[in-house]
Amino acid sequence: SDVCSSDCKALAQELPVKAVVVRHKKAVVVSMLLTWLLSAGIVVVILMSPVWLQKQYGFAPAVTLQANSIATIMLCFGCLAAGLAADRFGASVTFIVGSLLLAASSWAFYHLAGSHPEQLFLLYGVVGLCVGVVGAVPYVMVRAFPPEVRFTGISFSYNVSYAIFGGLTPIAVTVLMGVSPMAPAWYVLALSVMGLVLGFWLRQAGGCRAREADTTEGSVFFTNR
């Protein structure tokens, strides 16, 4: 089409990264914040928690490994559930409900695992399932950018955000543990609140639904219905 042709010609005259940063700032910011949520869920809950359980509550390494394996398996199911929910109900509802569940389950996990060690596998499995809300992150990112800059937009937003937050999260949580041993719980709670806010923002912006087909006129989740 004429619109596609003109867009492609304009894109060819400038760097794709420049086009993404200049023309799609909102999409970049939202994608980077969602990647931060993803990194918090994976790095803190899945990767750091086994060692935290050993130091904070004195669990044996073999026990935390088993619990972590259960959480990882449940994470896979959670990601599938989040994807299905995003297709069925939209990204906004998925992040609103998923973030609330993540906040509640992570708070319970970090605070009850020590006093109820017999419930460790259940608590870790449930929070692992709820971390699966991050499975809806790619759903939003794919629809955040128009086709002509989609690959560049996703790769730029994801890689820059994960390099920053994925790298700084372990350091930040470790430093915060000097203030409170429950730093992982507070960190995940804070990011869950951010996910909740983004969910409402997506709802206000028009949401992301599968029936909104790819267009060349702009990022589809910023198009009001």
Predicted regions and their residues:
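Hydrophobic core of transmembrane alpha-helices in multi-pass small-molecule transporters
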Residues: 118-135
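C-terminal ends and interior cores of transmembrane alpha-helices
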Residues: 100-114
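A late C-terminal transmembrane helix in Major Facilitator Superfamily
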Residues: 148-177
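Extracytoplasmic gate region of multi-pass secondary transporters
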Residues: 25-75, 165-169
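Cytoplasmic membrane-interface "Motif A"-like loop-to-helix N-cap segments
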Residues: 88-99
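Short, small-residue-biased leader/transition segments that mark boundaries at the very start
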Residues: 2-5
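Helix-to-loop junctions at the C-terminal end of transmembrane segments
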Residues: 79-90
